[in-house]
């Protein structure tokens, strides 16, 4: 599938964003939208038959499998979550296209297991906050959209090679004794 996209920025804001150190975050944030975060979550909106429906506008509930699994592991107390909360406030351009945070960029009280940072600091939340990070939840959403990422979720533990080798030798020994 081919597509053409563009990004444009209000040049009047660039100097202030550079001064406060958030210009790079703004560019990364907008690039993520360009390649699908919050813009290609609904296959019915973009006319891609057979695609997974990741989000229904107005629901506030992102349900993509990998993004949700990442959210469950990444944030404290979210192990049994059935969706990732999506922003419904802020109007057009913010609602339905960003991870949820308190309207105006305020903290949610949902914090990362790894470092205690609040969900409102995620790069793909709807309000610009200093110290933004690219969350595993966002990487999972990219995977849900079909991109390959470096996201590593906790998998079901596999037996060690030595244990598998030992089991194989035991199986061969038992087979030889019967024959």
What is each stretch, according to the model?
Residues 157-175:
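A short, hydrophobic C-terminal helix/tail in secreted or cell-surface proteins
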């Amino acid at each position: 599938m081919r597509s053409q996209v563009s990004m444009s920025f209000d040049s009047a804001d660039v100097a202030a964003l550079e001064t406060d150190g958030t210009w790079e975050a703004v560019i990364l944030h907008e690039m993520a939208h360009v390649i699908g975060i919050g813009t290609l979550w609904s296959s019915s909106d973009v006319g891609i038959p057979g695609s997974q429906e990741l989000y229904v506008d107005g629901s506030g509930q992102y349900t993509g499998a990998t993004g949700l699994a990442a959210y469950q592991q990444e944030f404290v107390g979210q192990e049994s979550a059935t969706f990732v909360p999506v922003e419904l406030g802020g109007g057009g351009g913010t609602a339905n296209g960003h991870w949820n945070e308190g309207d105006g960029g305020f903290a949610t009280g949902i914090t990362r297991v790894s470092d205690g940072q609040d969900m409102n600091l995620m790069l793909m939340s709807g309000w610009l906050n200093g110290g933004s990070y690219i969350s595993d939840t966002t990487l999972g959403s990219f995977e849900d959209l079909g991109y390959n990422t470096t996201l590593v979720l906790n998998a079901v533990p596999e037996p060690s090679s030595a244990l598998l080798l030992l089991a194989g030798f035991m199986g061969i020994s038992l087979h030889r004794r019967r024959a």
